[in-house]
Amino acid sequence: MVCSSQLVPRIQGWARELGFSQIGVAGVDLSAAEPGLMQWLAEGFHGEMHYMAAHGLRRARPAELVPGTVSVITARMDYLPRTTPEGWQAVEFERLRRPQEAIVSVYARGRDYHKVLRARLQKLSDRIAEAVGPFGHRVFTDSAPVLEAELARRSGQGWRGKHTLVLSREAGSMFFLGEIYLDMALAPTEPVTAHCGSCQACMDVCPTQAIVAPHRVDARRCISYLTIEHAGPIPPALRPLMGNRIYGCDDCQLICPWNKFAQPSSLPDFDARAPLEGQQLAQLFAWDEAMFLRMTEGGPIRRIGHERWLRNIAVALGNALRATRDAGEAGALRAALATRANDASALVREHVAWALAQGI
Protein backbone atom coordinates (compact mmCIF):
# COMPACT_ATOMS: atom_id res chain seq x y z
CA MET A 1 0.00 0.00 0.00
CA VAL A 2 1.33 3.44 -1.00
CA CYS A 3 0.72 6.23 1.54
CA SER A 4 -1.14 9.31 0.25
CA SER A 5 1.86 11.64 0.51
CA GLN A 6 3.84 9.41 -1.85
CA LEU A 7 1.01 8.63 -4.24
CA VAL A 8 0.94 11.72 -6.47
CA PRO A 9 4.66 11.46 -7.39
CA ARG A 10 4.13 7.77 -8.11
CA ILE A 11 1.12 8.57 -10.30
CA GLN A 12 3.20 11.11 -12.19
CA GLY A 13 5.82 8.47 -12.89
CA TRP A 14 3.30 5.89 -14.07
CA ALA A 15 1.66 8.51 -16.27
CA ARG A 16 4.94 9.31 -18.03
CA GLU A 17 5.32 5.63 -18.86
CA LEU A 18 1.91 5.82 -20.57
CA GLY A 19 2.80 8.84 -22.71
CA PHE A 20 1.40 11.61 -20.54
CA SER A 21 3.58 14.67 -20.09
CA GLN A 22 2.21 16.11 -16.87
CA ILE A 23 -0.17 15.15 -14.07
CA GLY A 24 -1.95 17.52 -11.70
CA VAL A 25 -4.57 17.23 -8.98
CA ALA A 26 -7.52 19.55 -8.42
CA GLY A 27 -10.25 19.76 -5.83
CA VAL A 28 -13.92 19.70 -6.75
CA ASP A 29 -15.06 23.18 -5.70
CA LEU A 30 -15.36 25.03 -9.01
CA SER A 31 -18.06 27.42 -7.79
CA ALA A 32 -15.96 30.47 -8.69
CA ALA A 33 -16.19 29.43 -12.35
CA GLU A 34 -19.97 29.11 -12.37
CA PRO A 35 -20.91 32.78 -13.04
CA GLY A 36 -18.62 32.97 -16.07
CA LEU A 37 -20.01 29.74 -17.49
CA MET A 38 -23.61 30.87 -17.06
CA GLN A 39 -22.88 34.27 -18.62
CA TRP A 40 -21.22 32.62 -21.62
CA LEU A 41 -24.25 30.40 -22.12
CA ALA A 42 -26.67 33.30 -21.61
CA GLU A 43 -24.98 35.23 -24.42
CA GLY A 44 -25.47 32.27 -26.75
CA PHE A 45 -21.74 31.93 -27.39
CA HIS A 46 -22.10 28.12 -27.40
CA GLY A 47 -24.07 28.25 -30.66
CA GLU A 48 -25.70 24.93 -31.50
CA MET A 49 -23.73 23.02 -28.88
CA HIS A 50 -26.95 22.48 -26.95
CA TYR A 51 -25.30 19.90 -24.71
CA MET A 52 -23.36 22.77 -23.14
CA ALA A 53 -26.57 24.33 -21.86
CA ALA A 54 -28.34 21.04 -21.17
CA HIS A 55 -25.93 20.09 -18.42
CA GLY A 56 -25.79 23.60 -16.94
CA LEU A 57 -23.87 23.86 -13.70
CA ARG A 58 -23.27 20.13 -13.48
CA ARG A 59 -20.22 20.86 -15.64
CA ALA A 60 -18.77 22.87 -12.75
CA ARG A 61 -19.78 20.38 -10.06
CA PRO A 62 -17.76 17.16 -10.37
CA ALA A 63 -19.44 15.51 -7.39
CA GLU A 64 -22.84 15.91 -9.06
CA LEU A 65 -21.62 14.38 -12.31
CA VAL A 66 -19.93 11.48 -10.53
CA PRO A 67 -21.26 11.10 -6.97
CA GLY A 68 -18.52 10.49 -4.44
CA THR A 69 -15.85 12.42 -6.34
CA VAL A 70 -13.51 14.28 -3.99
CA SER A 71 -10.43 14.79 -6.21
CA VAL A 72 -9.69 15.12 -9.91
CA ILE A 73 -6.48 13.98 -11.58
CA THR A 74 -5.73 16.05 -14.68
CA ALA A 75 -3.47 14.73 -17.42
CA ARG A 76 -1.67 16.46 -20.28
CA MET A 77 -0.70 14.65 -23.46
CA ASP A 78 1.28 16.52 -26.13
CA TYR A 79 0.11 15.93 -29.69
CA LEU A 80 2.55 17.49 -32.15
CA PRO A 81 3.71 14.72 -34.53
CA ARG A 82 7.06 13.19 -33.66
CA THR A 83 8.61 14.55 -36.88
CA THR A 84 7.54 18.16 -36.25
CA PRO A 85 10.36 20.42 -37.52
CA GLU A 86 11.88 23.47 -35.90
CA GLY A 87 9.91 26.53 -36.89
CA TRP A 88 6.76 24.47 -37.41
CA GLN A 89 4.52 27.48 -36.74
CA ALA A 90 5.95 29.35 -39.72
CA VAL A 91 5.56 26.21 -41.85
CA GLU A 92 1.86 26.02 -40.97
CA PHE A 93 1.31 29.71 -41.70
CA GLU A 94 2.96 29.24 -45.09
CA ARG A 95 0.53 26.42 -45.89
CA LEU A 96 -2.36 28.76 -45.14
CA ARG A 97 -1.06 31.00 -47.91
CA ARG A 98 -1.51 28.23 -50.49
CA PRO A 99 -5.24 28.58 -51.25
CA GLN A 100 -5.66 25.24 -53.01
CA GLU A 101 -4.06 23.18 -50.23
CA ALA A 102 -6.48 21.65 -47.72
CA ILE A 103 -5.73 22.55 -44.11
CA VAL A 104 -6.75 20.17 -41.35
CA SER A 105 -6.04 21.20 -37.77
CA VAL A 106 -2.82 19.62 -36.51
CA TYR A 107 -4.54 17.63 -33.75
CA ALA A 108 -6.87 15.94 -36.26
CA ARG A 109 -4.24 14.59 -38.65
CA GLY A 110 -3.55 11.49 -36.58
CA ARG A 111 -5.55 9.02 -34.53
CA ASP A 112 -8.68 10.05 -32.64
CA TYR A 113 -7.40 11.46 -29.35
CA HIS A 114 -10.52 10.35 -27.48
CA LYS A 115 -9.52 6.72 -28.02
CA VAL A 116 -5.86 7.26 -27.18
CA LEU A 117 -6.37 9.23 -23.97
CA ARG A 118 -9.33 7.27 -22.66
CA ALA A 119 -7.51 3.95 -22.93
CA ARG A 120 -4.37 5.30 -21.27
CA LEU A 121 -6.28 7.06 -18.51
CA GLN A 122 -7.95 3.76 -17.72
CA LYS A 123 -4.56 2.03 -17.65
CA LEU A 124 -3.35 4.71 -15.25
CA SER A 125 -6.41 4.12 -13.06
CA ASP A 126 -5.69 0.39 -13.06
CA ARG A 127 -2.10 1.06 -12.03
CA ILE A 128 -3.28 3.24 -9.14
CA ALA A 129 -5.67 0.49 -8.03
CA GLU A 130 -2.81 -2.01 -7.99
CA ALA A 131 -1.01 0.25 -5.52
CA VAL A 132 -3.86 1.37 -3.25
CA GLY A 133 -6.62 -1.15 -3.80
CA PRO A 134 -10.00 -0.69 -5.50
CA PHE A 135 -11.37 2.86 -5.65
CA GLY A 136 -14.26 4.60 -7.38
CA HIS A 137 -13.32 6.50 -10.51
CA ARG A 138 -14.35 7.59 -13.99
CA VAL A 139 -12.15 8.78 -16.84
CA PHE A 140 -12.94 11.61 -19.26
CA THR A 141 -11.41 13.34 -22.24
CA ASP A 142 -13.52 15.97 -23.96
CA SER A 143 -16.44 13.57 -23.73
CA ALA A 144 -18.69 14.69 -20.86
CA PRO A 145 -19.83 17.85 -19.04
CA VAL A 146 -16.43 18.60 -17.53
CA LEU A 147 -14.75 22.01 -17.14
CA GLU A 148 -11.49 20.60 -18.45
CA ALA A 149 -9.59 23.84 -18.91
CA GLU A 150 -10.60 25.15 -15.49
CA LEU A 151 -9.58 21.91 -13.78
CA ALA A 152 -6.29 22.00 -15.68
CA ARG A 153 -5.66 25.59 -14.59
CA ARG A 154 -6.42 24.87 -10.96
CA SER A 155 -4.15 21.82 -10.93
CA GLY A 156 -1.14 23.67 -12.33
CA GLN A 157 -1.18 22.39 -15.92
CA GLY A 158 -0.97 26.00 -17.05
CA TRP A 159 -2.95 29.23 -17.20
CA ARG A 160 -5.88 30.23 -19.41
CA GLY A 161 -4.74 32.18 -22.44
CA LYS A 162 -6.83 34.97 -23.92
CA HIS A 163 -8.03 32.42 -26.49
CA THR A 164 -9.31 30.40 -23.45
CA LEU A 165 -6.97 27.45 -24.10
CA VAL A 166 -4.59 26.27 -21.39
CA LEU A 167 -1.02 27.52 -21.85
CA SER A 168 2.11 26.02 -20.34
CA ARG A 169 5.56 27.62 -20.19
CA GLU A 170 7.03 24.20 -20.96
CA ALA A 171 4.58 23.04 -23.66
CA GLY A 172 2.58 25.91 -25.10
CA SER A 173 -0.97 24.79 -25.85
CA MET A 174 -0.51 21.91 -28.30
CA PHE A 175 -1.79 19.21 -25.99
CA PHE A 176 -4.89 17.27 -25.04
CA LEU A 177 -6.38 17.14 -21.57
CA GLY A 178 -7.93 14.22 -19.75
CA GLU A 179 -9.29 13.67 -16.27
CA ILE A 180 -9.85 10.96 -13.70
CA TYR A 181 -12.63 11.72 -11.24
CA LEU A 182 -11.94 9.69 -8.11
CA ASP A 183 -13.39 9.10 -4.66
CA MET A 184 -9.96 9.24 -3.05
CA ALA A 185 -8.61 12.43 -1.48
CA LEU A 186 -5.31 13.59 -2.99
CA ALA A 187 -3.39 16.75 -2.19
CA PRO A 188 -4.01 19.36 -4.92
CA THR A 189 -1.08 20.55 -7.01
CA GLU A 190 -0.53 24.30 -7.11
CA PRO A 191 -1.78 26.54 -9.95
CA VAL A 192 0.75 28.59 -11.89
CA THR A 193 0.98 32.30 -12.68
CA ALA A 194 -0.41 33.59 -15.98
CA HIS A 195 2.17 34.86 -18.46
CA CYS A 196 0.23 36.43 -21.33
CA GLY A 197 0.77 39.98 -20.10
CA SER A 198 -0.29 42.57 -22.66
CA CYS A 199 0.05 40.16 -25.60
CA GLN A 200 -3.14 39.71 -27.60
CA ALA A 201 -1.70 38.13 -30.72
CA CYS A 202 -4.31 35.36 -30.63
CA MET A 203 -7.13 37.92 -30.66
CA ASP A 204 -5.59 39.88 -33.51
CA VAL A 205 -4.87 36.88 -35.76
CA CYS A 206 -8.27 35.16 -35.49
CA PRO A 207 -9.66 35.16 -39.06
CA THR A 208 -13.26 35.63 -37.92
CA GLN A 209 -12.59 37.68 -34.77
CA ALA A 210 -14.19 34.96 -32.67
CA ILE A 211 -12.22 36.00 -29.56
CA VAL A 212 -14.57 38.85 -28.73
CA ALA A 213 -12.74 39.84 -25.54
CA PRO A 214 -9.84 38.42 -23.52
CA HIS A 215 -10.85 34.96 -22.30
CA ARG A 216 -14.15 35.16 -24.23
CA VAL A 217 -14.81 33.15 -27.41
CA ASP A 218 -18.01 33.34 -29.44
CA ALA A 219 -18.11 29.81 -30.82
CA ARG A 220 -20.56 30.89 -33.51
CA ARG A 221 -17.74 32.76 -35.24
CA CYS A 222 -14.98 30.20 -34.57
CA ILE A 223 -13.82 28.23 -37.62
CA SER A 224 -13.30 25.13 -35.49
CA TYR A 225 -16.95 25.29 -34.43
CA LEU A 226 -18.19 26.09 -37.94
CA THR A 227 -16.33 23.21 -39.59
CA ILE A 228 -16.89 20.59 -36.88
CA GLU A 229 -19.79 21.26 -34.49
CA HIS A 230 -22.09 23.29 -36.74
CA ALA A 231 -24.39 21.07 -38.79
CA GLY A 232 -26.18 23.52 -41.09
CA PRO A 233 -25.20 26.14 -43.64
CA ILE A 234 -22.15 28.19 -42.76
CA PRO A 235 -23.09 31.89 -42.53
CA PRO A 236 -22.20 33.46 -45.92
CA ALA A 237 -20.46 36.41 -44.27
CA LEU A 238 -17.98 34.06 -42.58
CA ARG A 239 -17.23 31.83 -45.57
CA PRO A 240 -14.64 34.12 -47.22
CA LEU A 241 -12.81 34.37 -43.89
CA MET A 242 -12.32 30.61 -43.62
CA GLY A 243 -9.73 30.43 -46.38
CA ASN A 244 -8.55 26.86 -46.98
CA ARG A 245 -9.31 25.58 -43.47
CA ILE A 246 -11.55 22.54 -43.90
CA TYR A 247 -11.44 21.00 -40.41
CA GLY A 248 -10.62 23.11 -37.41
CA CYS A 249 -8.34 26.12 -37.15
CA ASP A 250 -5.00 26.58 -35.37
CA ASP A 251 -4.30 30.26 -36.02
CA CYS A 252 -4.59 31.40 -32.40
CA GLN A 253 -2.12 28.69 -31.42
CA LEU A 254 0.25 29.18 -34.35
CA ILE A 255 0.73 32.86 -33.47
CA CYS A 256 1.22 32.27 -29.74
CA PRO A 257 4.84 32.88 -28.65
CA TRP A 258 4.57 30.15 -26.02
CA ASN A 259 4.08 27.49 -28.68
CA LYS A 260 7.74 27.70 -29.63
CA PHE A 261 8.02 25.46 -26.55
CA ALA A 262 5.36 22.99 -27.74
CA GLN A 263 6.57 19.41 -27.37
CA PRO A 264 6.29 16.59 -29.91
CA SER A 265 4.31 13.60 -28.74
CA SER A 266 6.17 10.51 -27.60
CA LEU A 267 3.50 8.36 -29.28
CA PRO A 268 3.08 7.41 -32.94
CA ASP A 269 -0.70 7.85 -32.68
CA PHE A 270 -0.59 11.54 -33.48
CA ASP A 271 1.73 11.32 -36.49
CA ALA A 272 0.01 12.85 -39.52
CA ARG A 273 -1.71 10.49 -41.94
CA ALA A 274 -0.71 11.10 -45.55
CA PRO A 275 -4.22 11.83 -46.90
CA LEU A 276 -4.71 14.61 -44.35
CA GLU A 277 -1.57 16.68 -44.82
CA GLY A 278 -0.47 18.54 -47.93
CA GLN A 279 -3.40 17.43 -50.08
CA GLN A 280 -5.14 19.57 -52.68
CA LEU A 281 -8.74 20.58 -52.03
CA ALA A 282 -9.94 19.13 -55.33
CA GLN A 283 -8.50 15.72 -54.47
CA LEU A 284 -10.37 15.54 -51.17
CA PHE A 285 -13.56 16.88 -52.75
CA ALA A 286 -13.55 13.88 -55.08
CA TRP A 287 -13.86 11.37 -52.23
CA ASP A 288 -17.14 9.51 -52.23
CA GLU A 289 -18.59 8.46 -48.88
CA ALA A 290 -16.88 5.06 -48.92
CA MET A 291 -13.51 6.70 -49.55
CA PHE A 292 -14.18 9.29 -46.84
CA LEU A 293 -14.96 6.57 -44.30
CA ARG A 294 -11.90 4.56 -45.30
CA MET A 295 -9.48 7.50 -45.19
CA THR A 296 -10.77 8.83 -41.87
CA GLU A 297 -11.07 5.49 -40.08
CA GLY A 298 -9.79 5.75 -36.51
CA GLY A 299 -9.45 9.52 -36.71
CA PRO A 300 -11.53 12.40 -35.32
CA ILE A 301 -12.65 13.73 -38.71
CA ARG A 302 -15.00 10.83 -39.32
CA ARG A 303 -17.47 12.15 -36.75
CA ILE A 304 -18.53 15.11 -38.93
CA GLY A 305 -19.63 12.81 -41.75
CA HIS A 306 -19.20 13.04 -45.51
CA GLU A 307 -21.81 15.77 -46.02
CA ARG A 308 -20.13 18.32 -43.74
CA TRP A 309 -16.76 17.33 -45.17
CA LEU A 310 -17.97 18.27 -48.65
CA ARG A 311 -19.62 21.44 -47.33
CA ASN A 312 -16.35 22.59 -45.77
CA ILE A 313 -14.28 21.82 -48.85
CA ALA A 314 -16.78 23.57 -51.12
CA VAL A 315 -16.27 26.77 -49.12
CA ALA A 316 -12.50 26.41 -49.37
CA LEU A 317 -12.69 25.78 -53.12
CA GLY A 318 -14.78 28.93 -53.49
CA ASN A 319 -12.15 30.90 -51.60
CA ALA A 320 -9.42 29.41 -53.79
CA LEU A 321 -11.39 30.32 -56.91
CA ARG A 322 -11.72 33.91 -55.76
CA ALA A 323 -7.99 34.08 -54.99
CA THR A 324 -6.61 32.73 -58.26
CA ARG A 325 -5.69 34.89 -61.24
CA ASP A 326 -4.74 31.93 -63.41
CA ALA A 327 -7.38 30.95 -65.97
CA GLY A 328 -6.26 27.34 -66.02
CA GLU A 329 -6.43 27.01 -62.25
CA ALA A 330 -9.83 28.69 -62.19
CA GLY A 331 -11.12 26.26 -64.80
CA ALA A 332 -9.90 23.26 -62.80
CA LEU A 333 -11.49 24.58 -59.61
CA ARG A 334 -14.81 25.17 -61.38
CA ALA A 335 -14.67 21.68 -62.85
CA ALA A 336 -14.11 20.16 -59.42
CA LEU A 337 -17.03 22.10 -57.96
CA ALA A 338 -19.28 21.22 -60.89
CA THR A 339 -19.02 17.53 -60.04
CA ARG A 340 -21.10 18.24 -56.90
CA ALA A 341 -23.45 20.87 -58.35
CA ASN A 342 -26.29 18.32 -58.36
CA ASP A 343 -25.29 16.50 -55.19
CA ALA A 344 -28.03 14.63 -53.34
CA SER A 345 -27.47 16.89 -50.33
CA ALA A 346 -29.13 20.31 -50.42
CA LEU A 347 -26.48 21.51 -47.97
CA VAL A 348 -23.68 20.55 -50.34
CA ARG A 349 -25.48 21.98 -53.38
CA GLU A 350 -25.96 25.34 -51.68
CA HIS A 351 -22.30 25.67 -50.73
CA VAL A 352 -21.17 24.56 -54.19
CA ALA A 353 -23.39 27.21 -55.78
CA TRP A 354 -21.89 29.84 -53.49
CA ALA A 355 -18.38 28.65 -54.31
CA LEU A 356 -18.94 28.77 -58.07
CA ALA A 357 -20.23 32.33 -57.73
CA GLN A 358 -16.90 33.40 -56.21
CA GLY A 359 -15.26 33.18 -59.62
CA ILE A 360 -17.68 35.55 -61.31
UniProtKB/Swiss-Prot annotation:
InterPro entries with a match to the protein in the record: 4Fe4S_Fe-S-bd (IPR017896), 4Fe4S_Fe_S_CS (IPR017900), QueG (IPR004453), QueG_DUF1730 (IPR013542)
Amino acids binding [4Fe-4S] cluster 2: C206, C222, C249, C252
UniProt entry tagged with the keyword Iron: yes
Reaction catalyzed: epoxyqueuosine(34) in tRNA + AH2 = queuosine(34) in tRNA + A + H2O
Pfam families: Fer4_16, QueG_DUF1730
Localization per record: Cytoplasm
Cofactor: cob(II)alamin; [4Fe-4S] cluster
SUPFAM superfamilies named among the record's database cross-references: 4Fe-4S ferredoxins (SSF54862)
4Fe-4S ferredoxin-type domain ranges (all copies): 187-216
Active-site residues, Swiss-Prot/TrEMBL: D142
Cofactor note: Binds 2 [4Fe-4S] clusters per monomer.
Principal subcellular localisation of the protein: cytoplasm
Family: Belongs to the QueG family.
Complex and partners: Monomer.
Protein name according to UniProt: Epoxyqueuosine reductase
Taxonomic lineage from the root: Bacteria, Pseudomonadati, Pseudomonadota, Betaproteobacteria, Burkholderiales
Gene (name only): queG
